[in-house]
From Swiss-Prot:
Record GO terms (molecular function): DNA binding
The protein's name in its UniProt record: Topoisomerase 1-associated factor 1
GO CC terms of this entry: replication fork protection complex
Region (Disordered): 977-1017, 1127-1162
Its job: Forms a fork protection complex (FPC) with CSM3 and which is required for chromosome segregation during meiosis and DNA damage repair. FPC coordinates leading and lagging strand synthesis and moves with the replication fork. FPC stabilizes replication forks in a configuration that is recognized by replication checkpoint sensors.
Keyword DNA repair in annotation: yes
Segments of skewed composition (Basic residues): 993-1003
Keyword vocabulary terms for this entry: Cell cycle, DNA damage, DNA repair, DNA replication inhibitor, Meiosis, Nucleus
Principal location: nucleus
Description of how the protein assembles with itself and partners: Component of the fork protection complex (FPC) consisting of TOF1 and CSM3.
The family this protein is said to belong to: Belongs to the timeless family.
Coiled coil: none
Species lineage: Eukaryota, Fungi, Dikarya, Ascomycota, Saccharomycotina
Amino acid sequence: MSEPDDVDTVKERLAEDRQNIHIQNEYQDISYTIIKARIGMLATAIGGPDHSVDSVNPPYKVGDDCLACIKDLIRWFKLVDDNQKRWDVEMATAEFKILQNDLIPILLDWEAKNSAATRKSKKTGEDISIFFPNKSYHDRIALGALQLMVLMTWPLIITDQSSYNQVNYYFELKKHQLLYKHAILTTENGKVLKAAIRLALNVMSVDVDHRTARDDSLIRMVLNFLKNVVAIEPGEVTISSVKRLKRPLTMAEMLPTNITVDDISINSVITAFDKNKVFGFLLTVASSLSDAVDPNFVSWPLLEVMFFLTKDINPIRLFKNQRKSYKLGTDHEITDSNMTTSGKHLSELLAKEHEKKLNVIKNTSSRHSRFGGLLSIQTPQNTRLTIASNSVNMRDDAALQELDSRKKWNKTITMRLDVIEGLSSSFFSTEGNSIYMSSDNITSIKEFLADFVDSSFNLLLQNATDSFTSEIQDQLPLHKIEYMLFISWFVKFQRSRCIYEIDATPDYVSGALLDECYILFTKYLRESYEQKNWPVVHAGMLLFTEYLEFLLSLDQSWEADVQAVISKILSENMLQLLASLPKSATSHSSQYVKACINLTHVVLKTIDKFDENSSLTVESKRKRKVNLNHTAIEKYAKDNDLDYESAFDILEEQFKQVTINFDKVFRGYLTEPTISTYIRYLQSYKELEDKDLIRVLKFFQRVFVKAKEELFLFRIDFMILCREILSQQGLPTTSELRTHFTKFNEYYLKQLKNKLKKMPSLYINILFPMLHDSQISYYMRHGKMKLTEGTPDIVLPSTFINIPDEGSLPKKVLLDMQVGILVSSLIDDGYEDLIEALLLNLQSSFDGLKGKVAEGINSLEEERVKKVAFNATNSEIKRALYQQPEFRRLLILAGFAIPEANQPACYFINNKTPTEVQLVIETIQKHRSLPFESEIGKPASYYLSSHYQEYEDPEEYGSDLNNGSYFEDLEIMDKRTEGRELSKGKAQSKLVQRSKGKRKAIAHHPEENESDFEANASSSTKLPVVSKEYIMDSDDEDPDFGAIFFENETYLRQLLDKHNGSLTETQFSLFAQFCEERVKNNGQLRNDYSALFNETPKSPIFSDVDAETIIIGSASLPSLANEPIETQVVSSEEYSSHPLEEEVTSEQRKRKKPRIESDTEY
């Protein structure tokens, strides 16, 4: 198709899309018009003013079909708004003012009649229905009106899944809901609230056993109504992962006409609640969650009421009335103690104007110097920069700023970046100190909250946590946010209360210290971070901060509980997550960044407190192999009066814990993104409080002074920021905080000058981001290049242990077994490439030796003197020459000299004949396809023991890292096997199934004491325990039978290998007699079977095996079951003196090696 045709096709598609959108909009308009007409008819039929009464304000009279109309409206809400994700019905009901003109009058009339009838009934003792005719019908109308009010006042929230219709109606409906709230709070002083409470009390007066689910739902509906009234506010409520920066809506744009902020503020809500006894109703419901009401119905709506009632209040202000003064150039001082919200905003604007006026006066010359000024600067290129301004005569920096302002820059193309907002400001007030509340309301709300905490907080939190953990489906993000911020606020409230009130105690919020609580919110924090659900992450950080602050504020009587809780919530995985939060906070909103910095400060303060005596132990993130000695468990159980299983669980838990080291935890925060987050936060220093600035400065001191990571702060943006902070327009000159910044800046510049003298290249480095190349980074830190040719850390080769009757086996049979063990172990660990590299080098050496045979003996002897270096094709193989113990032992068996401290090279020793080299090659190739099999089902690693010269406990918390990053995973096995398919690794499939977790098979180290060594060996050789439920008669037989059986299997495998996997009928018959005779005679032989084992083998691997070494008689038969297993650990000194020693004699083992307990002894 030609190009014009493509253009026409695109234009046609665009036209069709525009037409479809237009048709869809027309359809939506028609749909809304139809719905609006139906709602209008229902609104007319509900009722209206009774004009038959001669009165200026006629009473409201319900229509004949009032109840049916209300039910129809409820059905419309569910049919359209709920099921179709539209707000057409809500918009239509708002335009007809159904709530103000119909629902509120209905509830007020019902409340007045019901109250009067109740008083008369109490006086006369007669039934209330006598004084309130047709009461049940009117009760149903009132109940329907309240249900419809709940639907109309339900908080509107925009999420990523909101439809176009909902976004289009959002701001208009928000204004209508603000009108609803104003009408509810002000109509007859909020008597609608009393009517709603009366509906709930009528149900609560019925005995719990006689209530129905409908009755409990009514109580929940009343709580939802109270929650909606408190939650309606002019702020935009959005829960979105990404929100673009835009011009914020002013307060005038968000508010409807003739409504002020004070009319719907929290102060007005508290006034209405106090007058209509809402606080008493909430305390009644909260304190009777397990008695008078069903917690499954009311616990969550009650928690939401408390959350929205307190989220905009600063808890500290309830106990310490902070009076911020505003200097407006007058003789008197204005404070915010008795100032409305509007007056507060006006005072702030006047204060800013006064400050700017003083700044202008300070930077303007006097009338005697207003005669002009001229400054001309000659550049090295013989050009001149001239400035004519009065400001150049006052300060040098003013002249430079004038020059910069006159520069002509090329217009750069900037991309519009998404700024992640995190938690909406509607969920936590950023102006908590400036919200107006009268002194009477402060007293009322403080008394109510204190009573709630003393009587109901722990009970409500426990029920809410149980409901969260019992539900299978995941909770909504909104519910997670409300749950975490609810705990955060009341924990902070009680912490402040304990400071200002003597009789207050932390016991009343101790429910937050329960395992279920902190496990739940740490789970929400971790999962939300992985899912990039930033609002929930933001709420989790606020809770985590207050949680740690609360724990640190507890006295010595809580020390055990604090230790237990902190050791669980600050696990290694959680510390890693907390360190990653400020890394990703650069692109987030300022409030999100503030939460990150506050959390980081509290975490570091917590760890620093416990680091003084190294008393904080946390759960390790690594899976540790627990080897507990039977004797140690029994001793611990006896000393602590415990049973065996309890003692084992306690000791096992201790194995899973590690001690926190502050320096290694802080190392996780030493990253460039984290530093950038702090610098960006400090750039708005004029808007930050003193405590926030102190926290940022303290973090920089940790980085620059304590950690000596100066390179992170040697950057041009930080230098410019320090200069701006300490300028005349920066921090106030009389501020104590300025003194701290000045001292830090002096030390900073001193270190910078020293570094610049030592490394002139730093002049270039400070202009650009850090380079993460290891060589450059090392040079910038230490001022010298890193030695690239240095010898890596050297580990000792593995030694063989647990090999039965090792001393009596023929040399070549033992060599075959040892090579099989090493090859199978390497295959299991994913080191197939190491075996391949070894075979290539052996084949190269074999070809060289084979080619010299024809040249004569002299040439061959001359060739043997030469050292053939091992050819390592990549860095992994080269590192394995130094640090892989199994591979180093296999090199020795193959005839290589392995690298040592005094001999860093690896080379082939030409002291073997071509036949011997060929034998080694074929043995390795055989075990690649036919892995080693143990008679007792043990893996190949069971027969190996690794040694380390510079041993560090692999389970120690935060092992040292070469790159300086504490939280990087150093599990070598995972790195080498990740993403690798072990196509030829058949050894694993032949063995008993093992754990798929990370291998940590360090069996023993010279630094361990003998008891630990015996415990490890004992547990590693322990046979599985047989349950009594499955004990058969065979378990009572001779234990030697199993050993003889496995020995016969070994001899059969040797025969099969010897004859290439096939035996004749005569050989099978003879071998059957051989096995039967050994079984009958307890392993002893009466006849001669040399004819069976002394035939010439067909495989070249066993071509040189002597006949006398193969003949199996009663004297040479090994006994695998009764001999104790012994091994020897060779020290680094002994190994250095004998680098080529391949085995240790049994006499040396008996002399130097402590005996390991056998299975039967255990």
